[in-house]
Every structure is written in structure tokens, then in C-alpha cells.
Amino acid sequence: MKTIAVNSFKGGTAKTSTTLHLGAALAQYHKARVLLIDFDAQANLTAGLGLDPDCYDSLAVVLQGEKNIEEVIRPIDSSGLDLIPADTWLERVEVSGSLAADRYSHERLKIILSKIEHRYDYVIIDTPPSLCWLTESALIAAQHALICATPEFYSVKGLERLATFIQGISSRHPLNILGVTLSFWNYRGKNNAAFTELIQKTFPGKLLNTRIRRDITISEAAIHGKPVFSTAPSARASEDYLKLTEELLFLLRNI
């Protein structure tokens, strides 16, 4: 089982859309068994797959020892895609209950996921856009980190702090940076070269070749609670996310 934490230090980087479509592509087009984990209290991944966050338990109850992980997994479709939803309790889970007194609380998610490693080929975790307890726990539990950015100044500058954060974790836990993916891409953007150069300096050799172009069909798919492969299979967003999935699979197979 390969576990991937999808990260950014700033909102609006298509982190959740990337998580959703990577998982959906692996399940639908590569026949993989995929578990998506919404580890962000905003619960956008949950809503983007058509579930109401107020109606389901999140990993919070599992982290607190109140339920087993199998009890919070929700099937999304018959392709092999499952989801653990998010809820607002995630935002404060580390300061309540049994986690509050556990000095090794960051390790719990890794231990929990080890119990289902026979069940899935991939676990993909959508982390909050901040350097918080949830993000650290996800990175400790993961073997790989996928970093999301946009060709904007604040997004690219935020990568420097994220790089320092990840470096601190990888010094204690094995963690491979799978790559940096750029979304909302415009091939005619006048500052493209400057942004890509800064990313290469921050994460040398990790900028992925695939660019996710801006496409309204992604937002339209979210309204319907489905991936864009289902609502607009011929859209450029579908093409881009399938290419991204192929590129990531190549990297995973050649590590």
C-alpha cells in the first residue's frame, strides 16, 4: 500500500481537486483500490464527492479510539474508490480526549493505516493548507508527499516554508517528495519562467511536467459531487489529470 499526502501551504492551489482526481483516475482507469482521506476540517473533498460532512464520522473518532477505521470508510462508487470523510472535529482533535495527553499522538494515524494496508493499493490524504498537527500526522503516515502550487507569488513563496516543514519531518521519518504540481496554468503566462525557476530552487528536480490548466468543468463537476471524468470526460481538465496520474505512476514505479 502506497500512502501519499497531498500538501500546500496556501489555499486555492487545487489541492483538493488534485487529491480527488488522482484517486478517481487510479480507481477508474488503473483498476486500483483507492482510499481517499479528507483530513481537512473544511471537508471540501467530502462535499466534492457528494457527501454531507454533517452526516458522517471522520478520522477524529478513530484517532480518539472511539471507533475502528473500517467503521468510517464510505464507498464512493463501484470502481474501487472509497472515502473517509472530514468533519469540524478534526480541527481540534489533537487537543481533546486521549490525544491531548499523548506525546506521540502524531504517530497514531500511521498506526491506524497499517491495519488496512492489505485492503488498498493507494491511500491519498488531503491535508489542510497549513503546517498544523493534521498535516504533520499525515506526512508521518505517508511514504510520499505531493505538493500543490499555482503560478502566483504567494503560492510559490509559501513553498519555502513547506519545504522546511517537510525537511524536519523527513529527518525523522522516511518521506519521499513525489513532486510539485502546478494548477490553474496558463501556457502564455508572462511570469511562468520566474515561477518555475523558484520552484526548482526550492524543490530541485521535483517540478512535474504535467500542468493542470484552468477549466470551469472542475467546478461544475464538484457541484454534482463527481470527478470531472464522469461529468466532462473530454474536457481538458480530464486530459490533464489523466496525464498527471500517468506521470505519478511512472515515478512511483521507478523509485
Curated annotation (Swiss-Prot):
Transmembrane segments: none annotated. SUPFAM superfamilies: P-loop containing nucleoside triphosphate hydrolases. Disulfide bonds: none annotated. Belongs to the ParA family. This is ParA family protein CT_582. The lineage of its organism: Bacteria, Pseudomonadati, Chlamydiota, Chlamydiia, Chlamydiales.
